[in-house]
From Swiss-Prot:
Region (Caveolin-binding): 71-79
WD repeats (start-end): 436-475, 489-528, 542-581, 587-628, 635-674, 677-716, 723-753
The protein, known as: Striatin-4
Region: Calmodulin-binding, residue numbers: 165-182
Gene designation: STRN4
Bias (Gly residues): 43-54
Length: 753
């Protein structure tokens, strides 16, 4: 009985825990379920463990806690899925927005860069136009003025010349440009008066000559025909004079149109302009014009007083500084080639006047007339070249001649250097670039008579260059030269080189403490010839450390060397042994020597510089120091990198680490001059054989040429690049040719002409 009640309770509990719509009948565990009434109306559910489905007429099931929980879980899962899809779409849209923003920013940067490039090109174009304008006309172009460029106008049909001809803006700009030219060349009122008198003399004064009465401004003007030519020409003279004065003085009347003036000049109807040759910017502008003869009776000039003519010529000749050089002292005066009053002179004056007026028209910016000549005019004269202001002083002075002015061209590699004393006044340009070394070049030496150079490098080699065997790499580029011989014997960097007597031998010193004597091979040798062991003559041994400086005296046939071991030695290079003649121990008193040189005025004296800033003069015959030069500056001792001697004077020049160059008197030891020469340490010096100029090199990558007369810099050349905070190591001047050379830490040597 108890078991049946427990089974019924379990069945009731199980039925209450089923979800909505399940109508299975409970039964004992392990037994077949018995039929139970369905929760809702309708037929009873069938047994077998499965609940019977409600019938077609079943109504809504009542809510239960499990059903509510199931619904909430289902809705929560659907919400999470939609949220995940929304997050994915949001991330995708954000990525797309970021991509579009990046594209927009990139386009803005590109636009900014293009605008910057356009402005840069516009600026470069303005600079080129100003340069071309200055070369062509000799005056600086005013960037504020806008010039009408007809050639740049693109149109599908023919350009109407009437539009530009009647434009007041073109007239105004042309007058302003002419006024600027006249003011810049000193074309004052006095010169204008002289020019007015000359125009009168060329045209003829109609009032006095022809006896005609000049019409007033209100009276109608006579046409430029045979009947009314006298009055018209006198009025033309007056209008031309007023126009010239207005252009120069800058009055308010300069803005008026001058069409009425040019309309009465019949010989301007057939002017034809030809463009100048664009291939040569320095050619003067040539205008070929066809002239039309005027009746000679209206152009008979009045015979002016000779004194007035001379005064005019003297006044105008004061401004004869624009000549191209063709009208020298021996050039004939075209105004005095014929007898006064002859038909040839009248014709020449008439042609000059026509050229003046035609060129005034060209400067004003007017296009040439395209209409034919008026009926009844004679045949035009053959064209001839006439420039503006042709009649100033009767010479060939013109704005076109300003184009003949020359400027220094950096790409022009040729320079007339026949006079070595005046060579420093010229511009030195790079011509040869020597590129065969693999490390910095420490020293240079020129051949005494040939165009050959010897270089010593830290790569352990010396190389001989024949500068006459140059190969052009490209147009307007420095010439490349290949070495004809490489000297190899040093065990380490080669630090110094010196050329022997007559350039038969050369000497090199290196970090291996050895001095090698070399025989110079034939300069015409083939670089690919076999090795000649006789090139190495012998070795001078005696130093205990690196040899930093060498100097050879052709007078005494002695070789001087300075070493890091603290000694200065004098050698007889022609002797096999013992080659060392004397030794000057300097380490205890002055320190380590850095450079040595022979004095030109006293062949038995040498001068040595030291790291301590001292400069000592030695006597080879006595074997002792003569004088210690006062080479230390006021700021304290600084290392001296090189010492050289003036070729004609008892003067020693030193290059210091404190950017200075000092000039010392060998007789007194006092400093003669001191100057700050570079922006960095001065490393090397060279004096030309005539003593006219000094060349200095520095770690600021610049070469500077100094006039020894006034100690001023006449030229600066940037030739080398820095490497390990070092730039230029050595400079040299050719003893007999107009050549200079420099060597640097960039493993390049450059030759200048």
């Amino acid at each position: 009985m108890m078991e049946e009640r427990a089974a019924a309770a379990v069945a009731a509990a199980a039925s209450s825990c089923r979800p909505l719509g399940s109508g299975a009948g409970p039964g004992p565990t392990g037994a077949a379920p018995v039929s139970a009434p369905a929760p809702g109306p309708g037929p009873a559910g069938k047994g077998g463990g499965g609940g019977g489905s409600p019938g077609p007429t079943a109504g809504p099931e009542p809510l239960s806690l499990p059903g509510i929980l199931h619904f909430i879980q289902h809705e929560w899962a659907r919400f999470e899925a939609e949220k995940a899809r929304w997050e994915a779409e949001r991330a995708e849209l954000q990525a797309q927005v970021a991509f579009l923003q990046g594209e927009r920013k990139g386009q803005e940067n590109l636009k900014t860069d293009l605008v910057r490039r356009i402005k840069m090109l516009e600026y470069a174009l303005k600079q080129e136009r100003a340069k071309y304008h200055k070369l062509k006309f000799g005056t600086d172009l005013n960037q504020g003025e806008k010039k009408a460029d007809v050639s740049e106008q693109v149109s599908n049909g023919p350009v109407e010349s009437v539009t530009l001809e009647n434009s007041p803006l073109v007239w105004k700009e042309g007058r302003q440009l002419l006024r600027q030219y006249l003011e810049e060349v000193g074309y004052t009122d006095t010169i204008l008066d002289m020019r007015s008198k000359r125009v009168r003399s060329l045209l003829g004064r109609s009032l006095e000559l022809n006896g005609a009465v000049e019409p007033s401004e209100g009276a109608p003007r006579a046409p430029p025909g045979p009947a009314g030519l006298s009055g018209g020409e006198s009025l033309l003279v007056k209008q031309i004079e007023e126009q010239i004065k207005r252009n120069a003085a800058g009055k308010d009347g300069k803005e008026r149109l001058g069409g009425s003036v040019l309309g009465q000049i019949p010989f301007l109807q057939n002017c034809e302009d030809e463009d100048s040759d664009e291939d040569d910017e320095l050619d003067s502008v040539q205008h070929k014009k066809q002239r039309v003869k005027l009746p000679s009776k209206a152009l008979v000039p009045e015979m002016e007083d000779e004194d007035e003519e001379d005064d005019s010529e003297d006044a105008i000749n004061e401004f004869d500084f624009l000549g191209s050089g063709e009208d020298g002292e021996g050039a004939p005066d075209p105004r005095r080639c014929t007898v006064d009053g002859s038909p040839h002179e009248l014709e020449s004056r008439r042609v000059k006047l026509q050229g003046i007026l035609a060129d005034l028209r060209d400067v004003d910016g007017l296009p040439p007339k395209v209409t034919g000549p008026p009926p009844g005019t004679p045949q035009p004269r053959p064209h001839e070249d006439v420039f503006i202001m042709d009649t100033i002083g009767g010479g060939e002075v013109s704005l076109g001649d300003l184009a003949d002015l020359t400027v220094t061209n950096d790409n022009d590699l040729s320079c007339d250097l026949s006079d070595s004393k005046d060579a420093f006044k010229k511009t030195w340009n790079p011509k040869f670039t020597l590129r065969s070394h693999y490390d910095g070049i420490r020293s240079l030496a020129f051949h005494h008579s040939q165009s050959a150079l010897l270089t010593a490098s830290e790569d352990g080699t010396l190389k001989l260059w024949n500068l006459q065997k140059a190969v052009t790499a490209k147009k307007n580029a420095a010439l490349d030269v290949e070495p004809i011989h490489a000297f190899r014997a040093h065990r380490g960097p080669v630090l110094a080189v010196a050329m022997g007597s007559n350039s038969e031998y050369c000497y090199s010193g290196g970090a291996d403490a050895c001095i090698h004597s070399w025989k110079i091979p034939d300069l015409s040798m083939d670089p690919y010839d076999g090795y000649d062991p006789s090139v190495l003559s012998h070795v001078l041994e005696g130093h205990g450390d690196a040899v930093w400086g060498l100097a050879f005296s052709p007078t005494s046939q002695r070789l001087a060397s300075c070493s890091a071991d603290g000694t200065v030695r004098i050698w007889d290079p022609s002797s096999s042994s013992p080659a060392c003649l004397c030794t000057f121990p300097t380490a205890s008193e002055h320190g380590v020597p850095t450079s040595v040189a022979f004095t030109s005025t006293e062949p038995a004296h040498i001068v040595a510089s030291f790291r301590s800033g001292d400069t000592v003069l030695y006597d080879m015959e006595v074997g002792s120091a003569l004088l210690t030069l006062e080479s230390r500056g006021s700021s304290g001792p600084t290392q001296i990198n090189q010492v050289v001697s003036h070729p004609n004077q008892p003067l020693t020049i030193t290059a210091h680490d404190d950017r200075g160059i000092r000039f010392l008197d060998n007789r007194t030891g006092k400093p003669v001059h001191s100057m700050v020469a570079h922006l960095d340490a001065v490393t090397c010096l060279a004096v030309d054989p005539n003593g006219a100029f000094l060349m200095s090199g520095s770690h600021d990558c610049s070469l500077r040429l100094w006039s020894l007369d006034n100690k001023t810099c006449v030229q600066e050349i940037t030739a080398h690049r820095k490497k390990h905070e070092e730039a230029i190591h050595a400079v040299a001047c050719h003893p007999s040719k107009a050549l200079i050379a420099s060597a640097g830490a960039d493993a390049l040597a450059k030759v200048f002409v």
